[in-house]
A protein has these predicted regions:
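Short coil-to-beta-strand transition motifs
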Residues: 26-34
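Buried, small/hydrophobic-residue-enriched core segments of structured protein domains
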Residues: 27, 41-306
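Short, well-structured beta-strand-loop connectors
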Residues: 6-20, 39
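Acidic, low-complexity mobile loops and tails
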Residues: 1-3
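Short boundary/loop segments of OB/S1/cold-shock single-stranded nucleic-acid-binding domains
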Residues: 20-26
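Short beta-strand/helix segments in adaptor/scaffold domains that form protein-protein interfaces
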Residues: 34-37, 47
């Protein structure tokens, strides 16, 4: 449950906390931009829906100081991620929930293979971020043994030559890239045990923090689906309005289902929503609610199920 730690009218820098885990206040979530907090929107039972920040024309970031991950220990890595509001990007199994700093994982898993429907290739995002990705992997390896899962067709040297991790190559159909499937095949979670899972985009976020001392939540996502004019990739910032990403790309605005994620496991959303920190693709497909055939599926037919 999030607890908002800012008020409307406050000025925040990129990297300053917007909200924290109510059950574990040390786990904070960083603002992706510097600017003025314009609104804190709540839903039923005062559930926090979003914190809106109007970005400054000139961005400023809180400086947490550059760090040499090679000389850090696990406790120092945890503390750095907590201070910068990035620790919340780590999930734990079982239950796939955000973890806490007092949890001791037996292993950490990162899957760089994205094989869900219409998913983008992580190597596109990795290009130009190789140093940050390796720094993030090294930092995680200080906490626990770290496994990196890659696809048999992925060619990036930053993946195949990754250091301080155990590399596992997966070949097969979806869900071979699912991190839970990889955990089950490599180091299953037994009773009383916990493993951490980290999205590869978050690994880059971690690496940037240690290399530059600043929070940088830029990422590359896939914009796909049959209702997108030109499917491709978009370099965006976490928290960007979806209207700015797909607004001009949609073939039509009615009878379209916009999905944050992939068609199988993503969630239905709207253009008024914002890009989530764990989102790697935005999908637009037909809603299927514009069929006005009399009696619908009851009618006998030869080219469709009835």
């Amino acid at each position: 449950t999030p607890k908002v730690v800012v008020r409307e009218g406050d000025h925040v820098n990129a990297g300053d906390a917007l909200f924290a885990n109510k059950a574990c206040p040390d786990v904070k979530f960083a603002s992706p931009v510097s600017g003025i907090v314009t609104a804190i929107e709540r839903g039923e039972r005062r559930k926090v829906l979003c914190v809106k920040v109007k970005a400054d024309a000139v961005q400023t970031s809180t400086d947490f100081g550059k760090k040499n991950v090679e000389t850090m220990d696990g406790a120092a890595v945890k503390q750095a991620l907590l201070e910068a509001g990035l620790f919340g990007y780590i999930n734990q199994l079982p239950y796939a929930v955000s973890t806490t700093p007092d949890t001791t994982p037996k292993a950490i898993f990162v899957s760089a293979l994205r094989d869900m429907p219409l998913a983008g290739d992580f190597e596109v995002e990795l290009a130009g971020n190789e140093e940050a990705f390796q720094a993030g992997l090294t930092a995680l390896s200080k906490i626990a043994k770290t496994y990196l899962g890659v696809g048999v067709d992925q060619q990036s040297a930053a993946l195949s030559n990754a250091k301080n991790v155990e590399l596992n190559v997966f070949d097969g159909p979806c869900p071979a890239g699912n991190v839970g499937v990889q955990v089950n095949n490599i180091d299953p979670v037994n009773k009383g045990e916990v493993v951490w899972t980290v999205d590869p985009s978050a690994v880059i976020f971690f690496g940037r923090l240690f290399l530059t001392g600043k929070v940088n939540l830029h990422k590359v996502i896939a914009v796909a689906g049959s209702e997108i004019k030109t499917p491709g990739y978009a370099d965006v910032l976490v928290g960007t309005p979806l209207s700015a990403i797909v607004g001009e790309q949609l073939k039509q605005t009615e009878h379209v289902r916009l999905i944050e994620g992939n068609p199988l496991t993503g969630k239905k959303t709207t253009q008024e929503a914002y890009l989530g920190g764990h989102t790697s693709e935005i999908t637009a497909i037909p809603e299927g609610d514009d069929n006005e055939e009399m009696l619908g599926w009851i009618m006998p037919r030869t080219n469709d199920f009835s």
